[in-house]
């Protein structure tokens, strides 16, 4: 069964992915490009070039699930960096699906001071 438990690890395949790919094509990207096990219980999310569709792949122990969301208007705030995998929480994935960004503009950036006065 599809696992939507709060502790589920979600990986975002940053950049654009050809969403015409199905189970085997997406699993191959996970295995060959990102060197991860597509048969883990993790969720792997992919976005198209126009950022109007997201496809999520998850193995449940007996088969793959594919979930897909396509927007009628607007676009997802998907990370740009190609060839990178970003680990997010399930809650953050819900934010993406609701149109929010993980890096909202105007938020303070974390700093790491090197000198203590």
Feature annotation, model-predicted:
Residues 1-117:
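Polybasic/polar functional segments that serve as interface/processing modules
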């Amino acid at each position: 069964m599809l696992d939507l438990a709060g502790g589920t690890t979600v990986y975002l395949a940053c950049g654009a992915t050809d969403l015409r790919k199905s189970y085997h094509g997406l699993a191959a990207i996970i295995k060959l490009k990102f060197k991860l096990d597509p048969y883990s219980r993790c969720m792997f999310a992919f976005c198209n070039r126009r950022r109007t569709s997201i496809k999520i792949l998850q193995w449940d122990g007996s088969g793959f699930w594919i979930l897909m969301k396509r927007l009628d208007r607007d676009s997802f705030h998907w990370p740009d960096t190609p060839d990178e995998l970003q680990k997010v929480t399930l809650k953050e994935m819900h934010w993406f699906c609701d149109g929010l960004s993980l890096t909202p503009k105007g938020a303070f950036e974390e700093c790491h001071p090197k000198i203590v006065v």
